[in-house]
Amino acid sequence: MSKLIELNGTYNLRDLGGISKQVKDNVLFRSDRLSELCENDIVKLKSLGIKRIIDLRSVGEIESHKDKYIEGIENIALPISLAFTMDELNAMDENGVLMVLEKANEELITKHYKVLEKFLNLLLDPIPTIFHCTSGKDRTGFATLLIYHILGISIEDIMLDYMNSNDYLKPRLEEQFTKMNIDIKFKPLMFVEERYINKAINVAKEKYGSIDNFISDKLNFKQEKRDKLRQNYLLSKY
C-alpha cells in the first residue's frame, strides 16, 4: 500500500510508491491540503525532492486555505468544484449527504474529465509531485485510481489503498468532530466508503464500457501516453 509520510501539518500525505511492489518510491505523493505546513514540514518536503504540487480543490477552497508557498516548488491549480454548497448541505438529512457524496464521484466522470485529462498529461513529465484536495480522499482518491489503473495495479489493491484513507483520517477528524460539535449527519463527509468511488467506476462503465475506455476515449490518454506513464513510474522490471 502507499506509505504515510508524517508531517505536523498533514494527516493523509502518502507516497504512491511500493504498492504491489511495482511503483517507484519518492516520485508521486497524494495528500490532504497543504495550508497548515510548518517550517519543519517544508524542510522535509524539500528533502523528498518535491518540485511540483497539483491542487485539485475548488477555487473557494483554495482561496480560504491557500497552500503554503514553498520556494522552488511549482504549484498548479486544477480546480474540481464541489457537488454542493454549504447551504444545500445544511438542508440535507444523512441520506442526502450520502447521496451527494455519490454525486460528487459521478461528476468526476460526467463533469470534470477535462481536469483529469490535464492532470494525467502533467504526469508525463516525471518530476516529484504531490497532488491533493482537502482531505486527500475523494478527488485525490479517484486521481490515484486512474494512475494505478494505468500502471497495471489490481483493482483489489487499488480499493485497499483507497480505504486506507480512513486509517489516517479517523483519529484526526473524529477529534475535530467532537470538539466542534458537528451534526452527526455530516460524519460521512469525513471518511470514504467503497460505494463512493464505485459510483464513479460504474458511471464510467455505463457510459464508456470500462474505466480503461474512459481513460482512452474521454481523457484522450492513448497507449503511447500510457506507456510513457508506465516508464516514468514503474520499477524497471515491470
Report each predicted region and the residues it spans.
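Ser/Thr-glycine-rich phosphate-binding loops at phosphate-binding pockets of nucleotides
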Residues: 135, 139-140
